[in-house]
Amino acid sequence: MLGKPIVGITAAHCSEELKTFPRHYYVESIKNAGGIPLIIPPVRNTEEAKDVFQLINGLVLTGGGDISPTYLKEDPRRGIGTCFPERDLSEILLTQLALQQDLPLLGICRGIQVLAVAAGGGIYQDIPSQYPNSILHSQTAPRQYPWHDVDIVEDSVLFRLLKKTKIGVNSLHHQAVSEIPQGFIQCALATDGIIEGIEKLRAKFCIGVQWHPESMMETEAHSKALFRGFIEAC
């Protein structure tokens, strides 16, 4: 590929009126790692997703609200937060197409959960009520500061990128992957057993992380390494 890769970044919702917006941290992280960011508003069907894919060399699934139980094929549980089904549909369509085409993909926070659901895995709708012995995963410190440690699986792409077996990460979630999709492995784990990273086997680049590396780009070398590895694969 000639020139810098163009990376699609899924837009987040900020209201029930379905207004969408880009997140500054994601845009700057892609630019600083050597890519060109392109914000993707919600798509409505596979054809629109295919049109988007003609423009991009990689895809970032961003953080945001909860995934609707409709897409989990479950009844809603106590503790579930605000859902935007339009965004859920869009990101699941984009993710499934990325998996089919082996387009480099990085899922962040909500993004790891979308990746798991789109690939046939499962998530906890609410960690405190479904995983009662968990640590606090919704930090009370500013998002650029690490909140807890995660262990990195040595036989993983994530380890080869970060070159560390333990890192400090921020934590801003109450949902998490509960079932790893077929063809994926767990690549990061919190001390309480919550899955913090998954990756697809034999993929060009397909990693989901539960933390927000884009918010720690200025302070944590492992965040820079993750984005650089992603851009190099695009």
What are these regions (language model features)?
Residues 162-168:
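Catalytic cores of DNA base-excision repair glycosylases
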Residues 111:
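Active-site helix of classical SDR
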Residues 171:
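Short basic/aromatic active-site micro-motif
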Residues 207-210:
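Active-site-proximal beta-strand elements of phosphoester/diester hydrolases
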